[in-house]
Amino acid sequence: IAGHQQALFNNLQEALVSPAAQQKAEAVGAKGIRIVGCTCVGQDFQVRKDACTDAFCGHAGNNYTSEAVLSTGCIDLVLSEFNCTIPGIEPICDALQIPQICLDDVAKKKNAEYMPYSFAKKKEISEYVIDKAVASYAGRKDCDFNAANCAKALESVANPALREALAKVLLEVKKENGAAGRTNPMAQHG
């Protein structure tokens, strides 16, 4: 998720830990569905961690790290509601078959589905997002992903600690799955 308004995502995080969502995830081979926060809403979730459900698994960085996070192949859906979801992620999402949903027209991206948020329809929106994420995971879980492509993405990451952490993870994945590529890591981690 990316944006500024944690309140919009509160119902979603509660829905993600429901038995119904868990069953949907398990039906396609996932262990569950998690929220990875980027940008301001990720920081907000991090600050409110004690009030969050287990669906929130952490803050991955600001809007400039979104491209690196997407290029890992671990993300199955981008959900945004404000303009800090930077333009430029569209080609990455297209190449990795990651659907995008925007809840506000300020966040609308090329090739993204626009679904205006409505408090009255929050449950339906959350269910739709869950179904879309599950379908994306099911379609992507066995796809090949060439870890060599990540080296180019890492060259643009400015923070040395972040670059080192991502490189370490990618090297571990490469060792486990061979030099030719790897499958979506979420297939193993849920």
Language-model-derived ranges and their functions:
Residues 1-190:
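Metallocofactor- and cofactor-centric catalytic cores in central/energy metabolism, strongly enriched
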